[in-house]
Structure formats: structure tokens, C-alpha cells
Amino acid sequence: MQIWVDADSVPLTAKDLIIKTAERTKTMAIFVANQPIKLRKSPLLVMTVVPSGFDKADDYIVEQIQAGDLAITSDIPLANDILDKGGMVLTTRG
């Protein structure tokens, strides 16, 4: 399992919790956004920058996510696409 983060709109408190959880559970967390987001150096944390444009980060996540992966997003259409691929979804509020 990997954690995919729709990082364009993730609040700082949620980002910090995702990072701590990924490191505690030794789970890869991939943050996807159209601009870089500062992450601490860790082999478990990856920042993926996609081109600017409507739903580019969402499209990338849907292309890459595998059944059993977890995504963190507040985007309902993205969540639906992830569920269709067998992924799991949480909002930044749980």
C-alpha cells in the first residue's frame, strides 16, 4: 500500500499528520501537486510535480494508484475515480 496525497489543497496540519503516519508505519507517501511542496528528507516521502492545468494532479493520481492504495483528498470526483480503481479514500478530516 502507498499513500497518495492530492497536495494542491492539503492543510499543513493534515500534511504533518500524513508524514508522521507514513514514517511510523513505514509506508510510502506520494504528494502530488502542480507546484513543489516542502517535505522533510525521507526515503518514504516523494514530491511529484505535475504540469499546471485543470485536474492534472488528479489525473496523475488516478493513472498511478493501485487497488489497495490510500488517497487523501477532498475532491469528490477524484475520490470516485479512486474507488472505481479499488483504492481507498480519506478526506483531510478523516
Give the ranges of each region predicted by the language model.
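Nuclease catalytic cores that cleave nucleic-acid phosphodiester bonds
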Residues: M1-G94
